[in-house]
Amino acid sequence: MTVADLWFDPSCPYTWVTARWLMEVRKVRPVEVRWHVMSLSVLNEGRDDDPEGDPEGYLWIPARICAAVQRDHGQQALERFYTALWTTGTGDWIGDLRTALSAAGLPVELAEAGLGTGYDDVVRASHAEGIALIGGDHVGTPIVAVTREDGERVVFFGPVVSRAPTGEQAARLWDGTLLVAGTPGFHELKGRPHEEPHTT
């Protein structure tokens, strides 16, 4: 079976749309999705500007909770929590963290992990693993590393999509992305300017 490792910042709406696309892909292609946290807060450390507009460091909180969920409860729990973050709120951004933990069948006390630095090393290590695969910090979230059954690995940033395709459209985007990203020498492809993400 093909494995798609997804590195995601849980607060990024475009990444959530990409995650929904991968959930669709696994319905129509033999793909296992594995979840890994990364952090835009880590990515943007030391920059003069703050492209995320997060001077208070709020974006650390959901990333830390994801790291705690992954370390203490595993992959399936992380997928459930990440999904609940985006499906228990208003739909345009992540919902209440405790509500999402409860909806995912996880202890709501895990929300406390977001308020301290105890999981920062876990976040940083997972983030560094994804960034190392893509070869530097010239990209953001998400990073996808696809390992095919023959062992060949294709790594790419994105795709950044505003709407999650379903069914055969999801499969076509998957097949095309692997074809393009797996071409020796391929670096970048961009489409039209971004639309607001359709997160529901």
Language model segments and positions:
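Residues at structural and domain junctions
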Residues: F8, P51-E52, G116, R163
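Extreme N-terminal starter segment of soluble prokaryotic enzymes
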Residues: M1-D5
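C-terminal cap of thioredoxin/glutaredoxin-like
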Residues: W21-M23, W93-T200
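Structural alpha/beta surface segment adjacent to cysteine/selenocysteine redox centers
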Residues: P10, W16-L97, G176-V180, E188
